[in-house]
Amino acid sequence: MALDKLLENEAQSEIERIRAEARGRAEKIVADARERAQTLLDSRQRLLENQRQAGLVRARSAADLELNAARLTASESGVTQVYQMVEDYLGNVTSAPEYGNILSRLIQEGLQAVPDAEAIEVNPAEMNVARHLVSGVEVRENPSIKGGVRVVARGGKSGVTNTLSGRLERVKADMAPQISRLLAE
């Protein structure tokens, strides 16, 4: 029986060794699986965080663009309103008492630009004022002239228009940035 016992003990030892080896392999397999799962989980979390950050950047950029577009629209609207107010004022300045002085200067500047003037054209509403300001040159009515004069050269083929609204048009582009800056303050 001692041989049976010896064989049984030897078999039991072999079984324990195989079980221990199997447990070791199983623990390694489980540890490897956990490590792979953790690596995958970490990778997914980084990916999600990167996507979240990219989404935030896109949202901020879109908000900045929208804000800048709104500011630009407001600025353009403000500049347009300022120009409209100025144009309204210039449209009404012809009835102001000091308009005679303004018209006189516009006529003199026009005559300096066209020294051989044949005629000066003004709006029909300004004929009386213009006749008192001009001598030696014919004064004609021209309903298309508002707030200023057109000095016609001899022969009538050329001339210079010198109006308040024309002057405004010439300086609009230069003044727009300054007006925008003032409106933003």
UniProtKB/Swiss-Prot annotation:
Q: Alphabetically, which GO biological process terms does the record hold? A: proton motive force-driven plasma membrane ATP synthesis
Q: Look up keyword GTP-binding and say if it applies.
A: no
Task: Kindly state which keywords UniProt assigns to this record, in alphabetical order.
Answer: ATP synthesis, Hydrogen ion transport, Ion transport, Transport
Superkingdom, taxonomy of origin: Bacteria
MF-aspect GO terms: ATP binding; proton-transporting ATP synthase activity, rotational mechanism; proton-transporting ATPase activity, rotational mechanism
Q: Which GO terms describe its cellular component?
A: proton-transporting two-sector ATPase complex, catalytic domain
Per its UniProt record, what Pfam families does this chain match?
vATP-synt_E
As for what it does, the entry says:
Produces ATP from ADP in the presence of a proton gradient across the membrane.
Which protein family is it in?
A: Belongs to the V-ATPase E subunit family.
Q: What is this protein called?
A: V-type ATP synthase subunit E
Q: Organism classification, top ranks?
A: Bacteria, Thermotogati, Deinococcota, Deinococci, Deinococcales
